[in-house]
Amino acid sequence: MTWTTPDLCDRYPDVTIAEPLFRHFGGRTAFAGPMVTVRCFEDNSRVRELSAMPGDGRVLVVDGQGSLKHALLGDQIAANAVANGWAGVLIHGCVRDVEILATLPLGVLALAACPRRTERRDLGDVDVAVNFAGVPFVPGHWLYADANGVLVAPQPLALDGAGGSI
């Protein structure tokens, strides 16, 4: 089933829409799935760990606290995410290796690109509610993203009268 975030907003006017801060870096611009969240600052240890675990079509939401000094996602972690079935990654921070990210079948949204990697200090919190871009991102809630924007909903959104979901 095809969908767009404008169609979802028209059908579900109560969805929460993120401020338009993010750029697409991945090879897939439309993606959706239940969220797994990470809160970290200039340390992608948890992002790396999660990318190596089964994604099962989920979306990894990373609150990097808006830091533009270090990239929280690069080609190796993104390739792990693809291999393990993640639908996409939304990062309130930076990515790197953007030419390679663009070739991967993964949704990747971030604030910007930065060539500097993080230092891994084994820091970060997983499955905690985070808030950025004017949106509360809650583990298990659903994220929908495409070229028009990002929205979140507490459950999968049905597009037909029969209760089917995306």
UniProtKB/Swiss-Prot annotation:
Q: What is its EC number?
A: 4.1.3.17, 4.1.1.112
Note how many cofactor molecules are bound and how.
Divalent metal cation.
Known cofactor(s): a divalent metal cation
Q: Which NCBIfam families match?
A: NOT-MenG, PRK09372.1, PRK12487.1
The protein's matches in Pfam families, at most eight in alphabetical order, are given as: RraA-like (PF03737)
The entry assigns this protein to a family as follows: Belongs to the class II aldolase/RraA-like family.
| Superkingdom of the source species | Bacteria
Alphabetical keyword list: Lyase, Metal-binding
Q: Which organism is it from?
A: Xanthomonas euvesicatoria pv. vesicatoria (strain 85-10) (Xanthomonas campestris pv. vesicatoria)
Residue numbers binding substrate: G74, D75, Q76, I77, R96
Q: How does it assemble?
A: Homotrimer.
Q: What does this protein do?
A: Catalyzes the aldol cleavage of 4-hydroxy-4-methyl-2-oxoglutarate (HMG) into 2 molecules of pyruvate. Also contains a secondary oxaloacetate (OAA) decarboxylase activity due to the common pyruvate enolate transition state formed following C-C bond cleavage in the retro-aldol and decarboxylation reactions.
SUPFAM superfamilies referenced in this protein's UniProt entry, alphabetically: RraA-like (SSF89562)
Recorded protein name is Putative 4-hydroxy-4-methyl-2-oxoglutarate aldolase
Claim: Lyase is one of the keywords in the record? yes
S-S bonds: none
List GO molecular-function terms, semicolon-separated.
4-hydroxy-4-methyl-2-oxoglutarate aldolase activity; metal ion binding; oxaloacetate decarboxylase activity; ribonuclease inhibitor activity
